């Protein structure tokens, strides 16, 4: 998916990023072994200002969200609305000094953000984009990208990675481009695509180097 995206869109002009690999942000317990990925310098999420939007009530959301019609399947429709109700209750505010840059939906069980979970939930939540910017949930992963392009698949609410980048369990299937591509095909948001492209390209290069 990322290869397809890369073939369709040009990389933006570099944007300056001043977070060094020696920053306390990464809390390295070992010698600095980062091999710098130049595309990370274009990752504007790493130095973005924090935003903390709050969603409205479920009653307000129901007036905006798509209302399904499925004759003879009232129970399924009730489940649909219940899913939205639960989802809105799981929108969290970023903690101070966590390095997260925006409010996010957190469907996980332990307060952490999971790359897989949030990739899939944003695929669903894009239908509620007029009510709340759910897609920005993924911005918090991008904000935590390491200087070599690595992004941990699970990150605690305080912003710390759950796994070191040399741990083979620190990554999984790269679902981020899938979510972003679906969002783009629905909304045609060129600005967002241009912002996430260098981030995803840097992560793809890290995966290619370290997981193949």
Question: Which positions does each model-derived feature cover?
Answer:
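Short, well-ordered helical secondary-structure segments
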Residues: 2, 101-103, 108, 174, ...
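Bacterial N-terminal signal peptides
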Residues: 2-11
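Hydrophobic alpha-helical segments with strong N-terminal bias
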Residues: 8, 101-102, 162, 173
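Hydrophobic alpha-helical elements and their junctions with loops/disorder across both membrane
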Residues: 10-14, 90, 94, 184-186
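Low-complexity, Ser/Thr/Pro/Gly-enriched N-terminal "stalk/linker" regions
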Residues: 16-111, 136
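Aromatic-rich carbohydrate-recognition surfaces in CAZymes
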Residues: 111-212
């Amino acid at each position: 998916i990322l290869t397809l995206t890369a073939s369709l869109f040009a990389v933006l002009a570099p944007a300056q990023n001043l977070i060094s690999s020696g920053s306390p942000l990464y809390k390295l317990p070992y010698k600095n072994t980062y091999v710098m990925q130049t595309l990370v310098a274009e990752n504007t999420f790493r130095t973005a200002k924090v935003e903390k939007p709050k969603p409205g009530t479920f009653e307000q959301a129901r007036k905006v969200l798509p209302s399904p019609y499925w004759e003879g399947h009232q129970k399924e429709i009730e489940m649909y609305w219940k899913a939205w109700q639960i989802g809105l209750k799981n929108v969290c505010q970023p903690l101070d000094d966590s390095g997260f840059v925006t409010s996010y939906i957190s469907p996980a069980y332990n307060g952490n953000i999971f790359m897989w979970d949030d990739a899939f939930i944003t695929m669903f939540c894009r239908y509620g984009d007029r009510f709340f910017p759910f897609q920005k949930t993924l911005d918090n992963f991008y904000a935590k990208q390491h200087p070599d392009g690595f992004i941990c698949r699970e990150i605690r609410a305080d912003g710390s990675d759950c796994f070191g980048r040399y741990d083979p369990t620190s990554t999984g299937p790269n679902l981020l481009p899938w979510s972003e591509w679906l969002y783009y095909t629905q909304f045609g948001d060129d600005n967002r695509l241009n912002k996430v492209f260098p981030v995803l390209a840097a992560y793809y290069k890290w995966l290619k180097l370290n997981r193949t």
